[in-house]
Amino acid sequence: MSLLTPLRGLLLACITLGGQAMAGEPLKLEAYNPGHAAIFPVSSVIVSGAHDAILVDAQFGKGQAEQVVERLRASGKQLTTIYVSHGDPDYYFGLDTLTQAFPKARVVASAATVEHIRKTMDAKLAYWGPQMGADKPARLVVPQVLEGNRLELEGQALEVVGLDGPQPDRSFVWIPSIKAVVGGVVVSEHIHVWMADTQTAKSHADWLSTLTKIEQLAPRTVIPGHYLGDSSRSLDAVRFTAGYIRDFDTEAAKAADSAALIAAMKQRYPNLADESSLELGAKVAKGEMKW
């Protein structure tokens, strides 16, 4: 046997150990969702490494954003980045509070999300501000455009999936090193799914395609963007969302008006919370309301 053989083995072992060291320890997830205590039960997810952290989504009200600040400070990790996954205000109104607490953290979002925010933020604040009272933001923070489709935390990737697809404003975050999905706007659980923003058959087909893509990744963990109660943190949330979309389309095609559609969906899902989302979505679907 050549003397080079054991040397090659030693070299390969060193390369392997070096790669593991560069990758760092497994990332950890902490989800904060205010549930019934807030207008929107939206998820903010802290992704932590050994020393640093990335926050996905910034909450809606000041009080809820302060809860995220407390959790970040308690973690002892340095917040390097806040990533905003969608352009609706429950994903970014809390940036005012978070950027005051962590002024060195960069705030980024996809180009589609930044465009959405810029076009709608003044109208959204005018509508929601009076309802939020002391929880409304003192100022609106617009993220910078994320370059590319990934973030990095201590050598491990957070991939934004869907930016090159038909719905770049409805993407999700995939963390391959721990096989986890932060679902954002595309995944809900234990709640009537928000349908008002997707008003065409194609938009629903594209949404279902995104959910299929999540299933194909076979994640071990899925954190829904909106949920009430305890989340399964699994593909059950993805399957629930897909089933709801299909059922909504089936009943919308048969219903004479929004009242009939609402009744049919309540019969299919008698125990779901947030009926106001169903009522608004049904009115939009049946042409009784513009959104």
Language-model features and meaning:
Residues 1-11:
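Bacterial N-terminal signal peptides that target proteins for export
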Residues 47, 148-153:
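Short acidic-hydrophobic surface loop/beta-edge motif
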Residues 60-61, 161-165, 169-239, 244-247:
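Metallo-beta-lactamase
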Residues 25-74, 172-185:
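Conserved beta-strand hairpin/beta-sheet module of binuclear metal-dependent hydrolase folds
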Residues 16-20:
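N-terminal signal peptide c-region/cleavage motif recognized by signal peptidases
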Residues 34-36, 58-62, 83-88, 111-113, ...:
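A mature extracytoplasmic/lumenal domain signature
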Residues 11, 216-221, 228-291:
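Accessory terminal helices/loops
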Residues 74-150:
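Active-site HxH/HxHxD metal-binding segment of metal-dependent hydrolases
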